[in-house]
Amino acid sequence: GSQFGKGKGQLIGVGAGALLGAILGNQIGAGMDEQDRRLAELTSQRALETTPSGTSIEWRNPDNGNYGYVTPSKTYKNST
């Protein structure tokens, strides 16, 4: 959304993109059970901590066959 338009048009594009993302994310999340969400959360944490930027890692629920991928776009390591 933010790549297109200028001024108010650009802001509308950003808002529309955020709204669409929220709607799609909510629909996807509604199809996930508690174990799916747990696996996705654990995989997200592992991806952020150990996976190089641009590398996808998969989570898969063996009970229902649901799966997904997490791809960090930029990773940082805290020196503390």
From Swiss-Prot:
Q: What GO cellular component term, any one, is given? A: cell outer membrane
UniProt entry keywords in alphabetical sequence: Cell outer membrane, Lipoprotein, Membrane
InterPro entries for this protein: Gly_zipper_2TM_dom
Q: Where in the cell is it found?
A: Cell outer membrane
Principal location class: membrane
Please list which residues make up the signal peptide. none
Residue segments, region Disordered: 47-80
Topology in membrane: Lipid-anchor
In terms of superkingdom, the source organism counts as Bacteria
Q: Which Pfam families match?
A: Rick_17kDa_Anti
The record's similarity note reads:
Belongs to the rickettsiale 17 kDa surface antigen family.
Q: What is this protein called?
A: 17 kDa surface antigen
Q: Which organism is it from?
A: Rickettsia canadensis
Q: Which gene encodes it?
A: omp
